[in-house]
Every structure is written in C-alpha cells, then in structure tokens.
C-alpha cells in the first residue's frame, strides 16, 4: 500500500479500491488490488467490521507486526459509502488522511444531497450552502465544459442502475482558488418517498493532488460556446425526460426560482406543461415559447424558453435551453402579462 490510505467503495458486490492516497482508481476489486498482500484477509475483515459497526477500527495483525486502521465514510442518512483503510508497522502513525465527502443524487427526482465534507471538497462556502435538497445544477460546476464531462452528463441523462462513474475535475473554490476534485459514484435502485423505486447515485469526493490550472482540451468547443453567449440569455443543459436542470453554461438565471425544482412545488405553471412537452420532443429542431416559471416571491414569472438538443455522448442527448425575459410582443402573443 506504500503507506497511503486506501479508499474502498463498498456499495457494489465486492469492495473496490477507488483511491490510493489522493490518486483516483477505477473501481479495482480489493482482491485484485491487494492480491499479493499477505494482509489481504485481515484487511477484508477490518473493512467488514467497520461496515457492520459504522465505527472506526484499530486492529493488530495475527503476528503483531502490523496495525490496521479503518474510517467508515458515512452518508447523512446512515448508509456507508466506503471505508478508508491503512496498514503500517505497529507503532507507526498513518499519513494525513484525505477526508472523503459522501454524497447522494436522486436521479429520478433531480435532487442532490451533500454533506459538509463533500461541499468542502467541492470548494463551496458552508456558511451559505445547504447540503439538503439541492438541485443538480446547484451542485454541478457551472461554466466551461470540462474534459470528459460529457460522460458524466450522459450518465445523468441515462440514469442506469448499476452504472459507475469516476473522474477528476479542475475547478475553483468559492474564493476563486484553483482546486482539483476527484469523485466516484454508483447508481442503484432504492425505494423513494412515493413508494416507487428511484435511481439513486451514491458516491464520494475528495481533494486530488494539486495541479497547474487546467488547460481545456477542447478549445474549439469552448470558443463556440463563448461565441454564442448573449447578454441577458442564460443557457443550461437539462434532462429532456423530466426537465431536470443539469448544468448552467452561463451564469445561473436570476429572474426565476430554478432552485424550487428541489421541492414538491411544480417546476412550471401546470397550464404550460403540455406546451413544454411538445417543445422537448425536438421534432422541428430548436423551438421556443413563453412559459410561466416559479418566481422568487412564490408566484409565477413569464420566461422565454428556447430548447434544442445536443449530443453529450454517442447516442445520448441532453436538452439545451436558453432562458431570457420575454419582449412585450412575445407576452402579448402568449396571452400573458409581466405579472402572470
């Protein structure tokens, strides 16, 4: 183990190594990762005990020459997402432990649940960020598309049980400092509050090794994205099957309460749902119209919405939405007023 902590994800059929120290690993079964380690059985037993008790553990190997330490990674609902484990000479102190942050995304409802640890790792301000009931677009980094981000967006659109994902992204924290964050997630079916099975992505994140500020690998895509930006227009990617906002490409839209999607309140005026359903069929390419979206005061605000679709991965499409305030003529055509 080279003296580093191993982060072991424990939500699959077999515990899988997802990090060595701060270095990301792609769900390597622990029996493969430690196949030549004579303490494999002892470490498996330590992981199993931490899973059973939800407690940290310190144990000595049968020959009394090594110590094994474990730290469970427990989600706020009590579910264990993984176990940090370290083994070293008896009497030795382990290295500094990168603190994993457990997190959970309800892919069916479009609601994310973070923890103080996952928010800290993501560079968020704990004094203003609520870990519960977060819209996906609030948890997903806004702005430029990152290398390999299409895979994550495609996974969010497909929401397939059993799917796993791991990656490392460069970003900035709430104070503007460059950070690097690794994460892993696994989709599964769990009972939802409505009695149906929901697709739940459970995962962990942690701060990766520092690196130089990221150089975007797809500069052409970024130039196109920036070139199409317009003042007063706010673009985002969304899941066309349920209108869940996934990622803001521009600054988040300020004139309607897009965060209300994380509650039981309607995502738009009930009378406009049929119009939206027709728009998201994408039969005629880009389509647009005025929809009444949740206002910050609890009412409704008319918003001009243009939707199209974009291929985020081969044969997987997300919706692309552009939001702006409607013109008086567009309000009149829709039979609405600014106060509707």
Give a label for each model feature:
Residues 38-212, 255-335:
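Sensory/regulatory domains in signal-transduction proteins
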């Amino acid at each position: 183990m080279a003296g580093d902590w191993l982060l072991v994800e424990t939500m699959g059929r077999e515990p899988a190594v997802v990090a060595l120290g701060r270095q990301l690993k792609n769900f390597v079964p622990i029996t493969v990762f430690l196949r030549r380690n004579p303490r494999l059985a002892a470490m498996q037993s330590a992981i199993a005990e931490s899973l059973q008790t939800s407690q940290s553990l310190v144990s000595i190997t049968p020959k009394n020459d090594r110590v094994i330490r474990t730290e469970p990674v427990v989600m706020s609902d009590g579910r264990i997402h993984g176990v940090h484990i370290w083994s070293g000479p008896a009497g030795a102190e382990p290295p500094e432990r990168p603190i994993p942050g457990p997190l959970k995304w309800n892919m069916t409802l479009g609601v994310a649940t973070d923890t103080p640890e996952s928010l800290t790792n993501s560079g968020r301000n704990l004094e203003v960020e609520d870990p519960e009931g977060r819209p996906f677009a609030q948890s997903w980094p806004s702005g430029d598309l990152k290398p390999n981000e299409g895979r994550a967006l495609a996974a969010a659109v497909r929401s397939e049980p059993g799917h796993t994902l791991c990656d490392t992204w460069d970003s900035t924290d709430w104070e503007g400092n460059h950070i690097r964050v690794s994460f892993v997630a696994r989709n599964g079916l769990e009972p939802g509050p409505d009695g149906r099975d929901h697709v739940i992505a459970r995962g962990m994140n942690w701060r990766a090794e520092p690196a130089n500020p990221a150089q975007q690998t797809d500069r052409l895509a970024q130039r196109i994205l920036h070139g199409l930006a317009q003042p007063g227009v706010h673009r985002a990617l969304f899941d066309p099957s349920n209108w869940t906002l996934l990622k803001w490409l521009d600054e988040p839209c300020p004139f309607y309460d897009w965060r209300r999607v994380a509650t039981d309140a309607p995502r738009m005026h009930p009378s406009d749902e049929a119009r939206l359903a027709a728009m998201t069929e994408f039969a005629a390419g880009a389509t647009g119209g005025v929809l009444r979206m949740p206002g910050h005061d609890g009412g409704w605000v008319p918003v001009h919405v243009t939707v199209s679709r974009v291929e985020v991965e081969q044969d997987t499409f997300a919706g692309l939405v552009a939001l702006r305030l409607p013109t008086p003529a567009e309000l009149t055509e829709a039979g609405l007023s600014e106060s509707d």
